[in-house]
Amino acid sequence: MLQDYLTLRQAYLTRPDTRTQIHQNYVRNLFLYETFRLGGHNLPPTIFENIVSTGKPQSTETTRQAYDLWQAWQYCEKQAALRQPLDLTFVRAVSARIMKHTGGETTTSVGRYDTSLGDFRLGEDYDEVYPLADFRKIPLLLDNLCRTTDVQLTEAGVSENIKIVANFMYDF
């Protein structure tokens, strides 16, 4: 009996460590879920986890939005592995994936845009009376920010990259 225990223990100690991948998946899913909740969605975590693990949305709009977020995350992971640069094309591709099932064509007084294709909004957001941003300046400002951030990301280490990405989110 002791010999069986020692054999089992040795097999346990020499097995590959899979806990790190499980923990990374948990942290990733928790990050995505909290990001989804920041968007004002109230989806139970078990349903969100089911969408991520199966890769299939349910028939409600909220679950399709969660699925789109998951698909956008997978796209970002693939592009990061390929070391694709951060530019407007990448931002539009991610935007199109996030809005794939719930976006659509919108017509404003200044033109048409389709959020499901990753188009930028043609219209202004207002805070009470004053506009928050001039929509015509957004593509140029975003392009400049992408180029600056891309240069910083290639020159920085892993811990600095987190700060750079956080600054990117804050600046834009």
State each model region's role.
Residues M1-F172:
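FIC/Doc superfamily catalytic core
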